[in-house]
Amino acid sequence: MARAKFERNKPHLNIGTIGHVDHGKTTLTAAITMTLAALGQATAKGYDQIDNAPEEKARGITINTAHVEYETENRHYAHVDCPGHADYVKNMITGAAQMDGGILVVAATDGPMPQTREHILLAKQVGVPSLVVFLNKEDLMDDPELLELVELELRELLSSYDFPGDDIPIIKGSGLQALEAMTKNPKTKKGENPWVDKIYELMDAVDSFIPTPERDVDKPFLMAVEDVFTITGRGTVATGRIERGKVKVGDTVELIGLKDTRTTAVTGIEMFKKSLEEGLAGDNAGVLLRGLKKEDIERGMVIAKPGSITPHTQFEGEVYVLTEKEGGRKTPFFAGYRPQFYVRTTDVTGTIKAYTSDEGKEVEMVMPGDRIKMTVELINAIAIEQGMRFAIREGGRTIGAGVVSKIIK
């Protein structure tokens, strides 16, 4: 029988498993759901159910992602797991599954591998705030000294990407042993099996170490303008979805991007043709602005709390370039390439000045399917901030997806 909707009386977090191929991410995900299902806090999902992840589209890109949900004593979690490495890259860059924290899975038998590094780097670039490590396949390691060396290497690696390597909890265990114990006896509780206890230990670490994210509604107000029209006798209305924060009638706001920043006041808020006193994050609303004409506002501007976001023209972005099969380009491109950058609600033309590899070396040519860091200069200043997502388009089709990793100017 389908379970009723989770009660939202606990803080909600989005997390995911990341790490090198075959290090045990999906097995661990299955073990977590089965362990917590014994407490009635999850629906048990087998390996196959998670591995056969459905396709989704995010910003015009197809990604395979498995979603499971579960709760601990303290929190409710939505957990994403991706079957393939390319899916992880796409997922993290498009923000299709925004992560408040990650469980980095590393096989103790291998130690950190190339994708381990790549996922840590990506987590840093796209702004995953916090990681916890599960050192998997402990059952296959006879030498405790070797296990300790792998842990030290991991802590150094995390520190080298500016994560707090010395403080990050590293839980050793075996996803497979825990999964097998739970499959044999689905009612296994804490204290009844050492491998299952490791899963509880991991979830305790996730509960205590990964901070609760600030709710969207508590952040400074921002709404991207989608449309503008005039109401005779009342003034100019900008419509859009409130991305974060809240706005009240009488609030002072700034209009940012494409033209000089202007300060104005909110004289009314409408939703579904009704007047409201306040608009909240997630609402599709119309905001009436004092003293502005229709031509003062255009799609692509943002209305925001004064001083909370500023217009910029130059930034660095971490980008995934679509393959031809994904609907992207057939041919490579070079420095000086001028596509459109689709940010929030509008396309802005920009020139790509340079490309940089993970090692910090300059790259001449970018191929479809590459992940690359690029330096971009837009022809118009728009409201940009670190961690913001964008698409790269050419003649209306998406050829890449990116996230702003650094503001230059």
Swiss-Prot record:
Q: Could you list this entry's UniProt keywords, alphabetically sorted.
A: Cytoplasm, Elongation factor, GTP-binding, Hydrolase, Magnesium, Metal-binding, Nucleotide-binding, Protein biosynthesis
What gene codes for this chain? tuf
The residues that hold GTP are 19-26, 81-85, 136-139
Protein's UniProt name:
Elongation factor Tu
InterPro entries named among the record's database cross-references? EF-Tu_GTP-bd, EF-Tu_GTPase, EFTu-like_2, EFTU_2, G_TR_CS, P-loop_NTPase, Small_GTP-bd, T_Tr_GTP-bd_dom
The GO terms this record gives for MF are: GTP binding; GTPase activity; translation elongation factor activity
Q: How is this protein annotated for GO cellular component? A: cytosol
Where is it located? Cytoplasm
The enzyme's E.C. designation: 3.6.5.3
Q: Which HAMAP family match?
A: EF_Tu_B
Enzyme class, UniProt record, top EC level: hydrolase
Q: Which SUPFAM superfamilies match?
A: EF-Tu/eEF-1alpha/eIF2-gamma C-terminal domain (SSF50465), P-loop containing nucleoside triphosphate hydrolases (SSF52540), Translation proteins (SSF50447)
Region spans: G5: 174-176
Give yes or no: UniProt keyword Metal-binding.
Answer: yes
Stretch list, region G1: 19-26
Q: Check the record and name the NCBIfam families matching this protein.
A: EF-Tu (TIGR00485), PRK00049.1 (NF000766), PRK12735.1 (NF009372), PRK12736.1 (NF009373), small_GTP (TIGR00231)
**Annotated region (G4), positions in chain:** 136-139
Region described as G3: spans on this chain: 81-84
Q: Which reaction does it catalyse?
A: GTP + H2O = GDP + phosphate + H(+)
Q: What is the lineage of its organism?
A: Bacteria, Bacillati, Cyanobacteriota, Cyanophyceae, Nostocales
| Keyword Magnesium in annotation | yes
Please state which protein family the record places this protein in.
Answer: Belongs to the TRAFAC class translation factor GTPase superfamily. Classic translation factor GTPase family. EF-Tu/EF-1A subfamily.
User: What is the protein's species of origin?
Assistant: Nostoc punctiforme (strain ATCC 29133 / PCC 73102)
